[in-house]
Amino acid sequence: MAKMRVYEYAKAINVSSKEILTALKNMDIVVNNHMAMLEEKTIKQLDAKFKKGGAGVTSQKPAETNKNKPQGINQQPAGNQPNKIRDGKKNDVQNNQFNKNKKNNNNNKNKNKRNHNNKNQYQQKPLKPKKELPEKITFSGSLTVGALAEELGKEPSELIKKLMLLGVMATINQELDKDTIELIASEYGVETEEVIVLEETELEKYEEADKEEDLQIRPPVVTIMGHVDHGKTTLLDSIRKTKVVEGEAGGITQHIGAYQIEENGKKITFLDTPGHAAFTTMRARGAEVTDITILVVAADDGVMPQTVEAINHAKAAEVPIIVAVNKVDKESANPDRVMQELTEYGLVPEAWGGETIFVPLSALTGKGIDELVEMILLVSEVEELKANPNRQAKGTVIEAELDKGRGSVATLLVQTGTLNVGDPIVVGNTFGRVRAMVNDLGRRVKTAGPSTPVEITGLNDVPQAGDQFLVFKDEKTARSVGEARASKQLEEQRSDKAKLSLDDLFEQIKQGDVKDINLIVKADVQGSAEALTAALQKIEVEGVKVKIIHTGVGAITESDIILASASNAIVIGFNVRPDGNAKSTAEAENVDIRLHRIIYKVIEEIEAAMKGMLDPEYEEKVIGQVEVRQTFKVSKIGTIAGGYVTDGHITRDSGLRLIRDGVVIFEGEVDVLKRFKDDVKEVSQGYECGITIKKYNDIREGDIIEAYVMQEIERK
């Protein structure tokens, strides 16, 4: 009997690879994965086991069903607090009545006044019953001093005194933050718990938790990534056995297309992401909704810059990667070189002892396509992809556009639940009712289950690609949530929240907003990029680590800025500059770019920013010009320049440059500034003055003295 791989044996006896792996584990036979080779002896043992009855292998599964069952979160409202003010109000009413009677009594006026005052002085309100300290108090966001006192059963004045001892001056209606609430509660030995209340605009508030028994196997969502012209769309075309490329402008995919195929009764959904550099964000979005990434690399071209970008996106999304080595039918093809190059990025073939599946194929001739589809189904089986089809649909927008005839059109990928025609829906910051649905073949459908891509119409506006969508029970709620989300987005745009920058990095770290610092490193040569990356990854301050999301060689491009914007990263340029498009995009997206020529300066700047010790930035501002019209040499003083202020003004504490024939001769400071015989602080345009320069005497007639000051740039 010949040797067989795990998945081949599983296929031969008509069971899943996972059952075989479990059986081998129970037999104390170590195998890495479904691609491992089985010896003849092992195959015989498996034959014997499954002939006796393999039910024992799978019998453990049902017992685990309830283990991971999500427990519903019973968020009961806090019990109504006893109305403590009622007694007090009643007493006030009694006192008011008493005072009225007192005013009406005119006999013995002064005596009665004195008696009543004495009575009121000693007449005390009934004491409030003391409330026992609770074991735990819950709050959301913040509490006022009065509300916290109510929760603890204490007088507000008592809490105000405690706050004063802690250096906090607070009134009864002042809001207290989380730390102060916890500190005061700990003084009384009471635990605190912050309850996160979801806003009306958050779709998570309207979601229902799925039960384990409701989950069913769903088709995998596969993203095809790779460099330009490496054959991504041709590969997808070959898999679908239809012509997609011919309809694309210039043979390059212009929009994300979502397609579905069926193989042996099992469906697979494909996302075709554009490979052109300008569509970096579209490729990043494709990786966020995917279950498996197919990395297409041309066997005759090898690893290219966008191949590396695709690897980084797939790793960031934490999805398994299958490498499709395309164009193996070409004479110049060298699959081994591709495998060797990809090992540098952590993709080691199984044939070399790694865990990455490599499939050699030709998208043009169709060679290796069946094996690739089989590998996709195999990986999805191991991943155990599940969703609940019997609930309101939820998913992601793949693409959206405004069509002249149909209005707002959005391509949606249903990730869980079933989408129906007529469903009220909120998509990102838009809302509407699903008027019509069309599948990837252009046919009208009425329903779409998990992992199904459909094109819908009926929204009030065009959503953004990458937005989440959720179906609601009624149109009124959907409209309310959609309008609230649109209003919130408008407010956020007005506030113009800035991206992460080194200037405000320390504040964000202190507030807990930043746990990892994402960096994109671009250098002039690969060696510099590697050295800088290695040095940066060693930095760790207060538990905050540096994370390099992309490295590259060459100028900083628009693609780098878009990636930085999407991942909230800072761009580090080493001996390189940003091109024109990159500069304008960085300004529009508020992306921080730092340019350096010395490695240790980069390290120092990042560390200083993380520690909150970043030096302030200054910019030079020219404030005036003085034309030297005459010079005087005085012993013990040096050369005095008699000048005329031609522009702006000059001050005694300004810096200056001595310019002769357009060339800067000297840069220094003003020593003495006089007008006639008087020392002055400033001389304005149109006036004459006398100037001496610190430690410099070579001043000639016709020289220009340029005065400037260094102004600190306001941190953004």
From Swiss-Prot:
Record GO terms (molecular function): GTP binding; GTPase activity; translation initiation factor activity
Cellular compartments annotated: Cytoplasm
Domain of life: Bacteria
Chain intervals for the UniProt region annotation (Disordered): 53-135
Keyword Oxidoreductase appears in the UniProt entry: no
Annotated spans, G3: 272-275
Chain positions recorded as GTP binding sites: 226-233, 272-276, 326-329
Occurrences of domain tr-type G (ranges): 217-386
Region (G5): 362-364
Start-end of Low complexity biased regions: 93-109
Main location: cytoplasm
Record-level GO cellular component terms: cytosol
Bias (Polar residues): 57-83
Function description: One of the essential components for the initiation of protein synthesis. Protects formylmethionyl-tRNA from spontaneous hydrolysis and promotes its binding to the 30S ribosomal subunits. Also involved in the hydrolysis of GTP during the formation of the 70S ribosomal complex.
HAMAP family registered for this protein in UniProt: IF_2_B (MF_00100_B)
NCBIfam families, per the entry: IF-2 (TIGR00487), small_GTP (TIGR00231)
Protein family: Belongs to the TRAFAC class translation factor GTPase superfamily. Classic translation factor GTPase family. IF-2 subfamily.
Name of the protein: Translation initiation factor IF-2
Source organism per UniProt: Bacillus velezensis (strain DSM 23117 / BGSC 10A6 / LMG 26770 / FZB42) (Bacillus amyloliquefaciens subsp. plantarum)
